[in-house]
Structures are given as C-alpha cells and as structure tokens.
C-alpha cells in the first residue's frame, strides 16, 4: 500500500501488477479446477472466489484506471491513486468475473482498517502519515477481526455473486464506476490480453 514508484519484473506498476495482474493470472490458472468443482456440486454457492479490494477503490483517478499508467512507474500519479486504481480493478474485475462464471459465487471485499503494518510507509504526504500514526491505532482492528469480512464472503449463504462487501457482509457500497458494465468489460478485455501466452 502506498508504495513508491516501481515496476514488477514483468513491467507493471508495482501495486497494479501485484494487486490485480498477479491475482488475475493465478485465478486464470485455477479457474478450470474451480469451474469443474462447481459443476460437480449441487449449489454454485458452495464454490467461492473472494477478491480483496479496499475502500481505496473509491479514491482513484477519474477514469477508474488510467491504462496508460499501469505498464510504467506512473510517477505522475500519487501513490494513493496508484493503490486506488489497483483496488478499483479488484472490485470491477470481481463483478465482471461473476457475470462470466455464474456457476461460482464471486465477491470482492473491503477488510476495513486493519492493524497489520500495511499502512506503515514513508510514502504519502504529512496528512497520510498523521492518519497512520494517530487514527489507525484507534480505529484499526486486529488481523483476526479484519478477516471476518473475507470469511463471511467465503461462507455465508447470503453472499451475492458480483457484490462488493464492507465489514461485515454489508453490500451496496461499491463506487458507481466499479459497477459499470462497460468498464467491467474493458478491464476484462485488457486483462485477458495481458495474460495471453501465460501457461502453467
């Protein structure tokens, strides 16, 4: 989170490459087994994919994702815009994935402010560092508490495929742009093109 400008070894902006592209590639490799398992079970809700997003998905560039910045260091964007667009990709991709794989329950979740040390960074301005030092210790929850939303999405019969959940199991809080069918297709197409040629 809030990482300085850097690239993955595959040439993606570090946060986007780590939070979206890497996860999409792992999922590409796992999907055949996940789909096969879903077809063998009596209920699609028994097979789940939970994608970890963040409230930061709402704090991104005005276009949701600036695709011109995801294959370079994106130094013209703030570290929080870069993080936000990676988390935005998580929420939008989960929604699109759910449309394409209705036999699986797929949800994106915001774990909330969790005291993991993820926020301990030298990047960002004075206000963010003040937020880290003063508010996370007060409003943040333990990692065990922070895992509740993910566990809920992975197990609850009430989880709706394609939905974004805030703690715990609260739907309807995704940004309007993350719900855009047009943007979901655009992100899907971009991601599929990027993953071409990757094989196990």
Describe every region a protein language model picked out.
Residues 86, 108, 133-175, 181-185:
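C-terminal helical subdomain
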Residues 189-200:
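C-terminal helix/juxtamembrane-tail motif
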């Amino acid at each position: 989170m809030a990482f300085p400008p850097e690239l993955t070894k595959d040439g993606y902006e570090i946060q986007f490459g780590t939070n979206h592209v890497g996860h999409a590639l792992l999922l590409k490799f796992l999907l055949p087994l996940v789909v096969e398992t879903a077809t063998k079970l009596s209920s699609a809700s028994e097979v789940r994919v939970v994608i970890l997003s963040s409230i930061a998905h709402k704090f991104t560039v005005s276009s949701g994702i600036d695709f011109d910045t995801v294959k370079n260091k994106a130094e013209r964007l703030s570290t929080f815009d870069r993080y936000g667009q990676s988390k935005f990709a998580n929420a939008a991709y989960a929604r699109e994935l759910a449309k394409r794989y209705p036999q699986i329950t797929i949800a994106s979740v915001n774990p909330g402010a969790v005291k993991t040390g993820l926020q301990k960074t030298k990047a960002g301005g004075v206000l963010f560092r003040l937020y880290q030092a003063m508010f996370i210790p007060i409003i943040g929850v333990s990692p065990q508490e922070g895992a509740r939303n993910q566990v809920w999405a992975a197990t609850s019969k009430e989880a709706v495929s394609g939905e974004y959940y805030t703690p715990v199991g609260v739907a309807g809080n995704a940004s309007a742009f993350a719900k855009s069918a047009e943007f979901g297709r655009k992100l899907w197409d971009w991601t599929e093109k990027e993953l071409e040629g990757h094989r196990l």
